[in-house]
A protein has these predicted regions:
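Conserved anion-binding
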Residues: 103-114
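Conserved N-terminal beta1-alpha1 strand-loop-helix module at the mouth
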Residues: 1-103
């Protein structure tokens, strides 16, 4: 089985057992992604990814809040947070923590299947 098929099968199992209201109901500040990326200055989206299928662990035990703050302080226009647990070491909890601790747009990055 190739890695994409493995990811697909894992995501199907994950979805079948997940609570469809998994995200908390907190009200987070909203930041305009289009506006953040439309400045005359350099715009970029930084990514928080703790591991990958090809490289394994990239940043084991990393402090994701500090990483997000460092990205924001370095001038990132937005931050992408991988939320796939098995293959990328992410979680919805990471997404929530990042959104709570920075003041730029945050993007959830995960696999979408249909």
């Amino acid at each position: 089985m190739n890695i994409l098929n493995e990811i697909l099968e894992n995501k199907k199992r994950e979805i079948s057992t997940m609570n469809h209201f998994a995200l908390d109901n907190k009200k987070y500040p909203k930041y305009d992604l289009l506006k953040a990326l439309s400045t005359k200055n350099l715009s970029f989206i930084a990514e928080i990814k703790l591991k990958s299928p090809s490289e394994g662990d990239i940043f084991p035990g990393a402090d994701i809040i500090q990483i997000a703050k460092d990205y924001q302080n370095a001038g990132a226009s937005a931050i992408s947070v991988l939320t796939d647990k098995k293959f990328f070491g992410g979680s919805l909890e990471f997404l929530s923590k990042v959104k709570t601790n920075i003041s730029i747009p945050v993007i959830q990055k995960d696999f979408i299947i249909d």
